[in-house]
Amino acid sequence: MKKFLILQMRPEDEAAKSEFEALMRVGGLERNEVHRIRLEKEPIPVIDIHEYSAIIAGGSPFDISIPEEKKSPVQKRIEDFFIELFDLIVPIDFPFFGACSGNGHLGKYCGTTISNTYAEPIGNVDVTISDAGKKDPLLKDLPQTFTAWVGHKEACDHTPPGAELLISSKPCPVQMFRIKKNIYATQFHPEADANEFILRINVYRHYGYFSPGEAGELIHAIKDSKAPVSKEILRRFVKRYRSKKF
């Protein structure tokens, strides 16, 4: 059986390790079912997508929307990598799931603007499945409105051209979209729980997501929060593409 390729973009080892474990745990993946690549590490290896059953891309502290001259060489290298990756997967509709930063890379590639217009503070938000989303295999029969974990400085301004909007929210209209039949992206974090976000609050307290002095208050506000429905989306993606051949 082919493995899932998990792409990560977090230079902070503690956050990267925790995210990787969360993706496996929520997705129901065993360690021998995945190939992990940390894209911020040099060099990025050559990837043959046909060696994998699907690709999952996680989050990142890098901001796609900042001016090019302010981007580090590492960030530029990652952005160039995703352009090359999408040049491969989009034409053949290869299974892909991008969460948060993965969402931004796919949205930009497909032609929408990424900006801070629909930034969301760290915490839970109510999201709503669209009429099109109700028919999607990853969302069918889920509650129409449910809670999801968010925390981002930028997002898609609009649904990318040619994409199907699957989930939206009042603070951020583009919470999940699909390209063709097998390429997905979410602005929210389906892998996350309160412990995961508490760790990220501590790791990223000086990264501009919130005032550093607010960390304790944020942790207190989210420590008992849960978002079980959003996890089902990642589980369904793994289940759907675990045995399919492309």
Report residues per predicted region.
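Short, charged N-terminal beta->alpha structural module
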Residues: K3-L29
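Amide-donor transfer/coupling interface in amidating biosynthetic enzymes
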Residues: I6, E51, P91, S130-F246
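Cofactor-binding loop segments of dinucleotide-utilizing enzymes, especially the Rossmann-like FAD-
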Residues: M9, L39, S101
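Glycine/Thr-rich phosphate-binding loops of Rossmann-like dinucleotide-binding domains
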Residues: E14, I64-I66, G107
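Flexible gly/pro-rich beta->alpha loop and the following alpha-helix that scaffold active-site loops
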Residues: N32-F97
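A phosphate-binding catalytic loop at a beta-strand-loop-alpha-helix junction
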Residues: F96-H105
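Ligand/cofactor pocket segment of small-molecule handling proteins
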Residues: G104-H105, Y109-W149
